[in-house]
Amino acid sequence: MPQDDDWFWGRPTPVVVGDGETTSKPKPPVAGKTKKVEEQHPRRPGEPDCSYYVKFGSCKFGISCVYNHPDPRPQHGADDKKPAEQFPRRPGEPDCSYYVKFGSCKFGMNCRFNHPPRMPVPPQQEYFSGNACHCHHIEGKSKVEQVKLNVLGLPLRPGTGLCSYYMNRGICKFGTNCKFDHPDPGSDHEKWVVSSNANQVSSQVNIYSVLDHGESNEHTFTSEEVHQPGIPSFHQRISYTRDQLLQLCQNVEVPKDILKFCQDINVELNGEDKISGFGAEKDHVQTPSYKRFDATDSRDWHSWSAQTNWEQKFWDNFSEAKEPYSLGWKQEKFNKPDQSSFHFDSKDQWLKFIKCTPCKSTLIKAEVPLSIQRGIISGKDEVLKTLKSILNTFSPKMFDLQKGQLIETRISSADILKDVINLIFEKVVAEPAFCSTYAQLCTYLNQNLTPFPPEDCDCEEITFKQALSNKCQEIFESAHTVCSEIGKLIGQDREMEQRDKERVVKLETLGNINFIRALLKKKLITNKIIDHIVQAVMDCCKFRFEPLGKVDLLNIIFEGMLDSDSAGDESNICVNAMIGGNKSSIASNDVEMTRKNVNRQNEEAILQKSYDEVPNNKMDPQKNYADGAISYLIEKEKPTNLESSVRICRGGCSISEIMELVVDAGAVEGSDEHFMATLLFIKPEYREIFLTLDTREGRLGWLKRMYKVKE
């Protein structure tokens, strides 16, 4: 029957295997039960252990495995060490590093190294974690001492000293891990704990009496509970009602310094010599409003400020004074130690002091304050300020909108008109890309601005066109003066200054010429300005570091004037003369060609002849030599001279013929000069310039300079 019971409950039945060895043979499970049958492995003492079973805890051969399958459960009290024979000891050989680290060796008895005996590890004392153990742990002792706890759950350690944190606050942040003593509140130390907490509560009361708490809190403590820190609720935050705070406010004695300070503040703000709040007398206690922003201010600030308007001006003048003013006031203050500190009991005393005390610092104050100076702006400055704001945002897209704004600025005098033209020229130099737009703006102003009366009664009325022409002439005359000053800068120590000035003058000259070219198209200035342009270019060509070459001159003039209908015969002849100078044994690539090759002996005669032949004596005898040289070139120029006349030889050669001349000049195909020629000769004006150069060196040099300019 026992076997039947085992079969019924699903227990394995012992089975004899081999040499009297017993094992358990599982019975088939009862129907309706899903319990998994544990896999069985034979135990064979004396046989080597099954390595697969030892490593993974199972064996695929099961009950038929011929090796031993030890019990995986540890046996308490048994020696778990492996036999010493498994790891050989070889004195004199180095120790097996793997055995020393891990206590085992995979080679076993076949290892060639020494396996020293391992030192037994003493059993370590294990304790609970600090938060879980309630015992007192003493280092160096294996015996555990039980620690008692007080009513608050803190350890009692007599003889180790009192916990200062606990004695001051009634709690301990270290809890059961604290190494000091925490006596019960009812012990001999109760008086000390109660007195310390009473001081803490009184300090909190002083703080809460000043602050504004509004309505009372729901959870409150009585006075008895406040002075009993031993109860568990004492760890929570202490709260008070408004009545308790007011009662404490009346009982607490406020220091006299604080009362005096509050009195001074009330005098400054309210103008009343009263003390309100917790510092008032007990018989006349005024309950302040504990709603900080609910009460409305009933004081008449407007009438008070109107009555003391002069006082406000005094403080304005004081704040607007500069640093010397303030330093002088401070020096005067420190020189008189009896007046170094002032105390006013009321507003009337303060006003009386201001009226009676002489202020010497007002003697050095400016007659017109800075705030008033800022408000006084002349009509001219206001107009110029408006014009600058408009021109700073000037663009072709906004032209239609901004041109009307310029007219609305009320340009009402000749001085304002000159300043407007100066602003336009400054913007042109800074933004040369908008030259055509600014020329269009000048046309609009010329049409819509009425003439202005002259400064002198004998002169004619000043128009916009006349003022613009005068400005152009002044620009080139001043540029000529600057160029002459730059030529006087000699020495290595002034090379940087000379270079910077040359660059500035060159950029200004190019910007002004571009703008004048656009004005010539609009017929706003006469062609006489061409003489000044040529003179300015010749002056810039003398620069040492930033010279303005002939290529720049030709590009500027030909792009704007040559195809323009506004440019008359005079300007065209002038341009042709400068180009045709290359044919008359003059340096082809130098703008100063006339100054180097004209016969000096006939120079004065040529200038006098050109001056006599000019009708109405338009040419000034004090003109520079460049004007005479250009007149000489104009006289030599003939309309039938096809080689020097740009207009007659226009389009005379095809592009293929000109490219042959380019190759013949030394610009091999694939070079930078040949590439630049293919880009430039699409336009007829560049082909005409190239044909006027008669030497190969001159043509090749012209292409090289054009390549540098385009870069």
UniProtKB/Swiss-Prot annotation:
Q: Write out the biased-composition intervals (Basic and acidic residues).
A: 35-47
Q: Give the GO cellular component terms, alphabetically.
A: eukaryotic translation initiation factor 4F complex
Q: Name one Pfam family in it.
A: MIF4G
Q: What is this protein called?
A: Zinc finger CCCH domain-containing protein 43
Q: Would you kindly state one Gene Ontology biological process term found in this protein's UniProt entry?
A: translational initiation
Any idea which UniProt keywords this protein has?
DNA-binding, Metal-binding, Repeat, Zinc, Zinc-finger
Region Disordered: start and end of each range?
1-49
Per the database record, which ranges form the MIF4G domain? Answer: 384-637
Q: What is the lineage of its organism?
A: Eukaryota, Viridiplantae, Streptophyta, Embryophyta, Tracheophyta
**SUPFAM superfamilies in the record:** ARM repeat, CCCH zinc finger
Q: Name one GO molecular function term.
A: mRNA binding
Q: Where are the zinc fingers (C3H1-type)?
A: 44-72, 90-118, 157-185
